[in-house]
Amino acid sequence: MVYYEIIKDIVFTYNLQFTHLIHNDRISEVNLGGVTMRSIITQICNGVLHGQSYQSGSNDLDKGNSEIFASSLFVHLNEQGKEIIKHKDSDDKIVIGYTKDGMAFQIVVDGFYGCERQAVFSFIDNYVLPLIDNFSLDLTRYPDSKKVTESLIHTIYSLRSKHAPLAEFTMSLCVTYQKDEQLFCAGFGIGDTGIAIKRNEGTIEQLVCHTEVDGFKDAFDNYSSANIDLVIERNSVFNTKVMPGDELVGYTYVPPMLEMTEKEFEVETVDGKKINKRIVRHLNLDPGNFDDKDPLFSQLLQVVKSKQKQLVEQAKETGQIQRFGDDFTVGRLVIPDQLLINQLRIHALSIGVSDGLLSYIKNENENKGFLGIYGFFTGADKNIEKATLYKNLIAKYQNNHFISLIILSALVSDSKTPLMTQYLVGYLDFPSKALLANKITELLLKELENPDMREILGSRLATDVIEELETKIIRYIHNPAGSDIHSTLNLWTADKIKAATNSSLTI
């Protein structure tokens, strides 16, 4: 649970095999002592260029449950009310995604003004994002969510000090987890970013407050690193039960008139023999600006636009130099239901297996020896061919959850490829082949609860269909020229229900 004692030399990469899906499918990967962890990234924004804004598109992977908007609310006017142009690219970053177990998360980051923005962005990618899977798992494993979250905060401070001392930023972070068949969301906020939740029934609650300390802010920086426990104590750590459909909105800044003071208190700090007293304020979104019907995300964008226009008009009338505002980035994440969670888990596993097959192919190519002349004698050529066929099938049907699982199940049960299967078991960090097979079966049984799947299957028994398809996939892998597997698999799509239920599935 104490990450900073066990995590060493974390490395972050995007899965280059899927760069053609870069706007819809980002995979984060990290090696923790040989354990490969993967997350699905559905939305990401690394700031915006001066004078530009960014509105993310919908992502089919999570059924449009995530969005990001980014712009700048910086205003600098001269005495005549004319804009003073000063080029500044924004230093905000938001990442929205799901762990390999389908648990939703959101990371909201605001880099310091004038900071090394790329250092901030890289640190989040390389060192924070890879921690999310274990954070969610530990929240499930251990009873004290507050201690788990505080451990994560210590980890981030430790990693920053060691690997990215030039990265200075404030941050809010949240992740969901399952315990006792219920969904929860836990996380924290250090500094002036915030996270609010709009419940299904319309209630808005603040999970992470915008926190001020004597008018300034704590942060992930050298100054705050000197007393991390005190920083944690006066900022936000939370844990709350959530339901599918609840909306999590993270933001880096809103105009002050949209906030209200939720709490103000005094803390003491000791500097040598001197005792300093500091005033801490927790600021929330003022719920009076929002209704209980429309999404909080869209309401916040509209209210901010209106208030910003009002502020600019007032500033122009003063006849004085005016400077105010900040970068403005906001993210929306809707808690997925169990069906979508299962489908996200399927997708993550499919990508993991595909990546494992790529690694296996690379390994077999190395085993072929100088100029590859020993490939025939070692069997590497045959192994590479079979692994490539499986990999191509997974890539082709990755958006069909049922077929994806059938392919994975066939791969694991293929008695003629024991070395490849064993390689994948180790690559995916499963203790045994049986446990990997059980994982696939568990996901398959849950996918069969999907009403669309029941309609597709019609009167046919699922076990018969699964066994028949597995057999034909394995037959294709070992004799690709003698079968047309795609004609069979293409029957099992939503737009060919009738053909699927009436077909004898003869290749």
From Swiss-Prot:
Catalytic activity: [Rab1 protein]-O(4)-(5'-adenylyl)-L-tyrosine + H2O = [Rab1 protein]-L-tyrosine + AMP + H(+)
Listed Pfam families: SidD_C (PF21513), SidD_cat (PF21511)
Enzyme Commission identifier(s): 3.1.4.-
GO cellular component: host cell perinuclear region of cytoplasm
Superkingdom of origin organism: Bacteria
Subcellular location as annotated: Host cytoplasm, Host perinuclear region
A GO MF label: protein adenylylhydrolase activity
The keyword Metal-binding appears for this protein: yes
Any one biological process term the GO annotation gives: regulation of GTPase activity
Keyword terms: Host cytoplasm, Hydrolase, Metal-binding, Virulence
Binding site for a divalent metal cation: 92, 110, 192, 271, 326
Chain's role: Virulence effector that plays a role in hijacking the host vesicular trafficking by recruiting the small guanosine triphosphatase (GTPase) Rab1 to the cytosolic face of the Legionella-containing vacuole (LCVs). Acts as an adenosine monophosphate-protein hydrolase (de-AMPylase) by mediating the hydrolysis of adenosine 5'-monophosphate (AMP) to 'Tyr-77' of host RAB1B, thereby releasing RAB1B from bacterial phagosomes and rendering RAB1B accessible for inactivation by LepB. De-AMPylation of RAB1B cannot take place when LidA is bound to RAB1B.
Name by which UniProt lists this protein: Adenosine monophosphate-protein hydrolase SidD
Organism: Legionella pneumophila subsp. pneumophila (strain Philadelphia 1 / ATCC 33152 / DSM 7513)
Classification of source organism: Bacteria, Pseudomonadati, Pseudomonadota, Gammaproteobacteria, Legionellales
